[in-house]
Amino acid sequence: MAERGAHITTTSASDDRPSIFEVVAQESLMAAARPALHHIVKVLAESNPSRYGTLWRWFDELYTLLDWLLQQHYLSWASASFSENFYGLKRITLGKEVGQRNLPRKEYWKSLLLLVLIPYLRVKLEKIVNRLREEQDYSIQNPTSFHKRCYKAILASYPFVKLGWEAWFLFYQLRYILWNGKNHSPLLRLAGVQLTRLTMEDLHAMEKQEEMTNTLSNAVSLSQRIRSILKKALGAVALSVSSSLSLGVFFLQFLDWWYSAENQETLKSLNNLPVPPPPIHFELETYSPLLPKLKTVCPLCRKVRVNDTALGTSGYVFCYRCAYYYVKTHQRCPVSGYPTELQHLIKLYTPDG
């Protein structure tokens, strides 16, 4: 058994087939990029809603657009995604020799679509399921409607679909480790490619391709020159994004170290700083129509609150139904104007029930 384990961890180092640690590391790199950028945009939107609110509402679409530019640049230049190139890997057609330089057009487009669209669709599906689950928990939908039965069917089947999806990926990873499979991911199989290590010949070929592009750009027609300039501009945008992500990787490692157990004393000293005064626009007049005089009255419906619910972004308390519909429609707090999503609704349970 020990022989088998040693064989698994050492065979990949002697040939062009990457080890399981390399392929899993490159996948986790892009998986960590989206939550990190999402948190940064969230902080910006909460600090300045008027300027960054749109960026927060359309984050998934903007991130997908940047991801498309980034992956398109690296697939056309290095035959690999950004994370694969970061770890010295490239894509070749299944069954082809390791010396293959560029991906065929069919495999190129399949790789690009699977790299960009699958994560986007998965994030959107999870948001829809979470929203439907909240609506079901608090009986927001009409219990006799046809849509509610459809929602229940979706909520009942989603855990099994997710389990099947994860099991599909796990099977490919186990086959890659134990039986020397060609792919560690079914998405690579669907794209018709496999991963291999970059060689010195590949690096020299990339340099020559860049030199030839610069040489040919000086002896072409005006239309071709414009196309070349646009292509270089997109490449520059993708390169700047990739450089930012590379720096972000080291920044994430720094955050892991900063919030480790060894630095708890430092964090405690920082948390003991005095609380800053509230923003000026929070100091509303007592006669403001947004805030009723009685603390038990909902600011929206002007009735005694039912199912007290606070907004995590501002701290104001409303009826759950009032807060739910308002936040779902306007994506902001009705009193402070801070950007707010449904996940910021916090159900309150009083001691007297």
Swiss-Prot record:
Pathway: Protein modification; protein ubiquitination. It is found in: Peroxisome membrane. Pfam families: Pex2_Pex12. A zinc finger (RING-type) spans 298-337. Its main location: membrane. One of its GO terms (biological process) is protein import into peroxisome matrix. Residues 1-19, 77-104, 179-243 are peroxisomal matrix. Keywords: Membrane, Metal-binding, Peroxisome, Protein transport, Transmembrane, Transmembrane helix, Transport, Ubl conjugation pathway, Zinc, Zinc-finger. GO terms for molecular function: ubiquitin-protein transferase activity; zinc ion binding. Component of a retrotranslocation channel required for peroxisome organization by mediating export of the PEX5 receptor from peroxisomes to the cytosol, thereby promoting PEX5 recycling. The retrotranslocation channel is composed of PEX2, PEX10 and PEX12; each subunit contributing transmembrane segments that coassemble into an open channel that specifically allows the passage of PEX5 through the peroxisomal membrane. PEX12 also regulates PEX5 recycling by activating the E3 ubiquitin-protein ligase activity of PEX10. Belongs to the pex2/pex10/pex12 family. Component of the PEX2-PEX10-PEX12 retrotranslocation channel. The three subunits of the retrotranslocation channel (PEX2, PEX10 and PEX12) coassemble in the membrane into a channel with an open 10 Angstrom pore. The RING-type zinc-fingers that catalyze PEX5 receptor ubiquitination are positioned above the pore on the cytosolic side of the complex. PANTHER family: PEROXISOME ASSEMBLY PROTEIN 12, PEROXISOME ASSEMBLY PROTEIN 12 PEROXIN-12. This is Peroxisome assembly protein 12-A. It comes from Xenopus laevis. The gene is pex12.S.
